[in-house]
């Protein structure tokens, strides 16, 4: 961003609010855009996102608006912090010369990567932001780290400068598919971990699930050109640990609710892993890949298996060596 210009943060949910606060903490003024004018007006007045991030006050450096053209006016790039299903509509309303930083951990409606979808619309400067980042902790200024990946090193460096502070380390990467898809797939594994919690399967089961889930992530990501180092980095293993174990995690909580026979919906908040499971399962079937944990979650969320049946299918797979080539 140019000196003194505000960083557009498009999306005033919990994560968008936390990123706007993080930018201000780094000395970067921010413009937080909310889709609903009434919500934006209330947020601007009370200076606290009581619906999505209660207890975190907006600093003076964060302005709030519902005017999208005004929010991005004069900006070099913007953070897009809306659920994946809302990204296409938001992209359609943005100037193509704007750099876009995609912060959702999901897929486009057609199952493609959001970065590919943005490039297909004519955006030449695209980045993705991902890591073990719970909004509740980032907003409070607790220590954390994240990764911004882009084929445009200047864009990645600019995002790093805008967000890096004593409480948030920002690393750069050129591995866009690895950083982007690690955040997508770990959500599904976290749903499975939550189901295990809801079924009271114990620590051994969770450790097994996360270890085999990481192997599943590695096979899937590397088949799409990701680097193995990324899989075991912040946006892969790091995000998996945070999402599969934390009480803040929507995906883990949704899986636990399903296992208990309750609704996985959480006050209107989007649970990316529930939608992504079906898209990833369809991709695996179409391309001849075996993603057993993804398949189990997809079958359960479609109502074709119960959580207990999902466990039986996973535990009943054929015997094999732990590290057999090509096997998850």
From Swiss-Prot:
The record's Gene3D superfamilies line, in alphabetical order, gives: N-(1-d-carboxylethyl)-l-norvaline Dehydrogenase, domain 2, NAD(P)-binding Rossmann-like Domain
**PROSITE patterns in UniProt:** NAD_G3PDH (PS00957)
Pathway(s) where this gene product acts: Membrane lipid metabolism; glycerophospholipid metabolism
Which domain of life, per UniProt?
Answer: Bacteria
Which catalytic residues are annotated?
186
Any idea which GO molecular function terms this record carries?
Answer: glycerol-3-phosphate dehydrogenase [NAD(P)+] activity; NAD binding
**Pfam families in the cross-refs:** NAD_Gly3P_dh_C, NAD_Gly3P_dh_N
Task: Supply one GO BP term.
Answer: carbohydrate metabolic process
Q: What is its main location?
A: cytoplasm
UniProt entry tagged with the keyword Lipid metabolism: yes
Task: Report the EC number(s), separated by commas if there are several.
Answer: 1.1.1.94
Q: Which reaction does it catalyse?
A: sn-glycerol 3-phosphate + NAD(+) = dihydroxyacetone phosphate + NADH + H(+); sn-glycerol 3-phosphate + NADP(+) = dihydroxyacetone phosphate + NADPH + H(+)
List the GO cellular component terms. cytosol
Recorded family membership: Belongs to the NAD-dependent glycerol-3-phosphate dehydrogenase family.
Q: What does this protein do?
A: Catalyzes the reduction of the glycolytic intermediate dihydroxyacetone phosphate (DHAP) to sn-glycerol 3-phosphate (G3P), the key precursor for phospholipid synthesis.
Under what name is this protein listed?
Answer: Glycerol-3-phosphate dehydrogenase [NAD(P)+]
Question: Whose protein is this, by species?
Answer: Deinococcus radiodurans (strain ATCC 13939 / DSM 20539 / JCM 16871 / CCUG 27074 / LMG 4051 / NBRC 15346 / NCIMB 9279 / VKM B-1422 / R1)
Organismal lineage? Bacteria, Thermotogati, Deinococcota, Deinococci, Deinococcales
